[in-house]
Amino acid sequence: MRITTMLARVRSACIQGIDAALVSVEVDVASGLPAFNMVGLPDTAIRESRDRVRSAIKNSGFTFPMERITVNLAPADLRKEGAGFDLPIALGLLAATGLIKGERLKQFLFLGELSLDGEIRPIRGVLPMALACRREGIAGLILAPGNAPEASVVDGLAVIPVATLSQAVEFLCGEREIDPVTADPAALLAHDPGDEVDFADVRGQSHAKRALEIAAAGGHNVIMVGPPGAGKTMLARRLPTILPPLSLNEAIEVSTIWSVAGLVPSDRGLVTVRPFRAPHHTTSDAGLIGGGSVPHPGEVSLAHMGVLFLDELPEFPLNVLEALRQPLEDGEIVVARASGSSAFPARFQLVGAANPCRRGCPTLEACVCTPGERQRYLSRLSRPLLDRIDLHLELPAVSYSDLSQGPQGEPSATIRARVLAARRIQTERFAKTKVRTNAQMGEKLIRRFCQIPAEGQRLLALAMERLGLSARGHDRIL
């Protein structure tokens, strides 16, 4: 029997930074000349959904109402973007024309882009939307099968995958049974896929490996200066293999950022290893820090809880390098736009690498650069930026004797065990604070835990005088 109501409400969501806000999709079908109007600050992709929704409804075997249609995305003052409103708009139209009961729609939140034949396509940002769905007490989430693994990591939420618009209608009308998709995030984290690289592969550079172990234990930033082929990139790529595994909360936090960027692994739905990001030195400040007309996370946020490796550090534009100062200090980046500001987490370990000179000469003796050229090249790294990097390493060229020998170093698993032991000590030390690693200590904690004898104080005073260290540099040394 046809339901006479001509107004329907369907719940959906949109991304705001790395969080999600609920959106009520209100669909009104009234008599009058055929029209399809959309209000509520939709972006171009949402406005274009009129044609996608019309074709999807017709090609799914349903009748598209030839009446005056108004779609409102509430709240109206919230900017919306993306094609994820296609499915709720289509279902709202079918409900307004009496095909679906409105009471059934109230039980779920709907997300998905529609193709012209009615197929439901995955969208990005599903994980924060699923978290918002649970937070608001909504029982279930209906979305594309490609997004189901990602949403299923949210406990206490019925995730219903539907492949087409007609399947969604059949499910809502009680004509089709679809089992919810479930996942065990703890089991996903416990499954160790194994590292493709290992510290045992590194020949020589024992002092650099020791420094990276200290950096991993305390969460310190590192810069390595050495000739090409010294192993800077090789060492940096192996740093994540000795970092502690992600906890469940950390994995969900990282996965939320990656979900907004559309990078969550489709087979697991959860980022289970610490990120390693290595952007090219031609990256713009928006690409590194984040930005856009609607702010999106940059490389510093994608490296959250992991490693950000910047090779050829002096080759990066100066404005990009200086933009690193806020996330290195605060652990987050705030992107401000006229419509508002968004805060993205950016608690990463920076590993920078640089050649001693622009030409990349193998040794100082063989270098054809003048002392002034070498100084100008490295002086592109400002003092405020260098003050935020705890460990400065000079790497020599790898000798033939080191290369000719087989792997002699410790495997990553052995080093990681020592790192985990050091992290446990820090956890006990900072139990009553928000600090988790030595690198995060502020001035008060440094004064409390980093007491040095008189001889060490004299040496530090001499270093500050001769090297011109700042107060921040003083604290970093301690």
Locations of regions flagged by a protein language model:
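Basic, amphipathic alpha-helical bundle interface domains used for macromolecular binding and assembly
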Residues: 45-50, 65, 72-82, 295, ...
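The Walker A (P-loop) glycine that initiates the GxxxxGKT/S ATP-binding motif of P-loop NTPases
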Residues: 226, 290, 312
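Conserved alpha-helical scaffold flanking the Walker A/P-loop in AAA+ ATPase domains
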Residues: 213, 269-275, 283-308, 340-341
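Peripheral, non-AAA+ core regions of ATP-driven protein-machinery
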Residues: 1-223, 227-230, 336
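Walker A/P-loop
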Residues: 223-268, 330
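Walker B catalytic acidic pair
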Residues: 305, 311-313, 323
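Long, charged amphipathic helices and adjacent flexible linkers at domain junctions
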Residues: 175-199, 264-278, 419, 432-433
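Catalytic P-loop NTPase motifs of RecA-like helicase/translocase cores
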Residues: 117, 310-317, 360
